[in-house]
């Protein structure tokens, strides 16, 4: 026969004897003196009011009251402050009552089952994720910041893999399903917009072959790699254009999901109400770990997190102790350093603009035309300038941020902001220079652009030219990473290990610079977003590049780098990195949408030949649909649809804001209750010390 919760309580005489052996003030008087008693008299349903118990009350009656009270509560049995046997009896009693009364509805049952299934699927997905053990090992040895870099790299790798599948299904396959695409235009084909003759050489020398491979010219210029290869077919034009919006939407949704999940961790980590130290000490350990290696890795992760908290607390304490004169000195230093940062950025942008503007002029000189290596260098001149500035300025930004007196997490954010501005703005300046060449500086009445709407004399297929520039940026970024690793980092590590003296100290210890590495990923991904419309296979190339980069960085991390002397919060990485990715996605959308809606497509290449704009293909395709489908699609663009949609969206937004405000007030109330509970514990500890001292004296 099963025992009741009351009988289970009766098996623990220590709970009863402790009350009888207690001396001093009664429990009711102590509870009434608690700080929370002055503001929180009503404790909610199911909790006995304070002051109702007395020491002379019948013991069984009080235990029965507590048991009956707990049975009325809806909280799970594991949350009750009871012995284990009493909680088991209480859980069985609740189960019998639920079966007898049928209080658990079918909807609640399926909701519970769905939540359990979702949790199990999430755990299983995390278990089968590629390189999960590698990331865990990196986090344990080098900290959460370094782990976040590899996590972001894995995330971008799979996004590019998905985009590559969509590109192949919506561009390559439709091209070959409707027949073999035509060859390149011949020299006899001309139009009012000139002629376009891709240089598809046959047998060439090895230097020329290498030049074509690295520049995207020659046999690659008329290949599925670039926009100009795809023939002007209506079905292909629709799938080509729709793939751009489909891939962009997928990127946006996945990055937003990652940003929101990181925002929750950031808000919790940055909260000052809950002490980070107690959270790390009491709830950070995973009791399901098996094996010494897993235990040591978890210990290192907790150690790094505590180290970050202690470092930032020390910096904040020093900041609060500063005098007015010291604060003025600090702010003056920060102003001067920011002026220096602006000067460095201005010099970098001017160099990139100069390199892009004069590349065409230098390519036409006889010396460059006769020397293949010099021609390759001139062709890569904008990419070289961008890579040099991206290699030199981030360490300078790191040094400048260390002089500004911020916490390490704030320094990471500043370095990220400055570096992302450098990398993305340099790409913007490159695109602006190319736009200036394509559209004659925006002057459509100029002689070169008046006939066709673009500079057809210098750039007969401007989409392929843009794709080639993005292709060269992706390749050069990969080559720079390989060269820096093989020619700088490995020799530096060997020199540091073989020369323990002054020369070894001069070479220094290599530490993994997370901000610079992350911004390199975001810059590379932004280049791919810009160029994927003009170079459809660029996501596939970037997938292979990220795969090579993952293994290269993993090998160099464990063989060259040492754990960072200063770390930063994982919450900063989990939220800020996807946020910068969103900025890169927004920046990349501007040139792509501008090309689709405003610049006339090339007249001699690509699937949109002869159109006033690339977007003009959509209305023409709609007109070929049945009348019912046309009416429905045109209705989506009228005010009869957009105005109700705007009203419904506004109502949903207001509801979301109101719900967020309610949750905010609830969170504030819970925080106040936590503070009150802390005061209660302090008060009880003080009373216990006072009573112990009094009993010792007596």
UniProtKB/Swiss-Prot annotation:
Membrane-crossing residue ranges in chain numbering: 155-175, 236-256, 335-355, 381-401, 412-432, 470-490, 518-538, 540-560, 579-599, 640-660
Membrane topology, from the record: Multi-pass membrane protein
Family statement: Belongs to the TMC family.
GO terms (BP aspect): sensory perception of salty taste
Gene: Tmc4
Reaction equation(s) it catalyzes: chloride(in) = chloride(out)
Cytoplasmic face of the membrane: 176-235, 356-380, 433-469, 539, 600-639
Region (Disordered): 1-25, 74-104
Subcellular location(s) per record: Membrane
Function statement: Voltage-gated chloride channel involved in high-concentration salt taste sensation. Depolarization induced by high NaCl concentration may trigger the activation of TMC4-mediated chloride influx into taste bud cells, helping the return to resting potential. Also allows permeation of organic anions including gluconate, but their current amplitudes at positive potentials are less than that of chloride. Involved in pH and temperature-dependent modulation of salty taste.
Alphabetized UniProt keyword annotations: Ion channel, Ion transport, Membrane, Transmembrane, Transmembrane helix, Transport
Name the UniProt record assigns to this protein: Voltage-gated chloride channel TMC4
GO molecular function, one term: voltage-gated chloride channel activity
Organism name: Rattus norvegicus (Rat)
Ranges per topology, Extracellular: 1-154, 257-334, 402-411, 491-517, 561-578, 661-698
Database matches in InterPro entries: TMC, TMC_dom
Major localization listed first in the record, in broad terms: membrane
Pfam families for this protein: TMC (PF07810)
GO cellular component: plasma membrane
